[in-house]
A protein has these predicted regions:
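Helix-turn-helix
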Residues: 11, 19-53, 57
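Amphipathic C-terminal alpha-helical segment
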Residues: 92, 96, 140, 160-173
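Generic hydrophobic, amphipathic alpha-helix propensity
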Residues: 8-17, 33, 58-62, 66, ...
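N-terminal intrinsically disordered/low-complexity leader segments
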Residues: 1-7, 150
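Hydrophobic alpha-helical connector segments
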Residues: 57, 71-100, 153-160
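Amphipathic alpha-helical segments used for helix-helix packing
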Residues: 81, 96-118
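Amphipathic alpha-helical packing segments from all-alpha helical-bundle domains
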Residues: 72, 80, 117-143, 155
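Solvent-exposed, amphipathic alpha-helical segments
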Residues: 15, 19-23, 69, 110, ...
Length: 173
């Protein structure tokens, strides 16, 4: 009979999100993860599929928080919600202005070396979600007459996403 778990998966993930955000995927070794989580290498492998699985779970938690808090107002918003989102990127102390940059941007940059298809999909999904939120706000503003009907909303949203990536990269420096 298997022993019952003496840990909460969400508590374990909560403990590693910040560590991965601060140090990156490659810089955190399995021994450090064992110390942070209280789990041994076997438990990390069986519960999360190893270090990469734990990282993906942490990245997913981070993304869900950003989507449900920072991005959410743009889903039904217009220009003011986009402005508020962008201002938060440069407002010290906000979730989106961390000295560690953005975990998603950091993951994308680091994955150029790691070359994990799973990480690539997770990063792309986040940026697609952000772009969809920008499109929603821009389209609402266009319907409301705040943006000329001739403006390509998708191109504008794509440009905003690129700008967000740049700000997050700059925040890390």
């Amino acid at each position: 009979m298997a022993r019952p778990k003496n840990y909460s998966v969400s508590d374990v993930v909560e403990r590693v999100v910040f560590a991965f955000w601060q140090h990156g995927y490659q810089s955190l070794g399995v021994r450090e993860l064992e110390e942070l989580t209280g789990l041994n290498q076997y438990a990390i492998r069986t519960e999360f599929g190893g270090k990469e699985g734990l990282y993906l779970t942490a990245l997913e938690m981070y993304c869900e928080r950003a989507i449900s808090s920072a991005m959410a107002p743009m889903k039904d918003g217009k220009i003011p919600e986009i402005i508020a989102f962008l201002q938060a990127l440069v407002t010290k102390g906000s979730m989106t202005s961390s000295q560690f940059g953005c975990l998603v941007v950091n993951t994308g940059i680091e994955n150029a070396r790691v070359n994990s298809p799973r990480l690539e999909v997770a990063v792309a999904r986040y940026w697609d979600t952000l772009e969809a939120h920008f499109v929603a706000s821009l389209r609402n503003a266009q319907i409301d007459g705040q943006i000329d009907p001739a403006v390509d909303i998708e191109a504008m949203a794509n440009g905003l996403v690129s700008g967000v990536m740049g700000v997050h990269t700059k925040n890390r420096v």
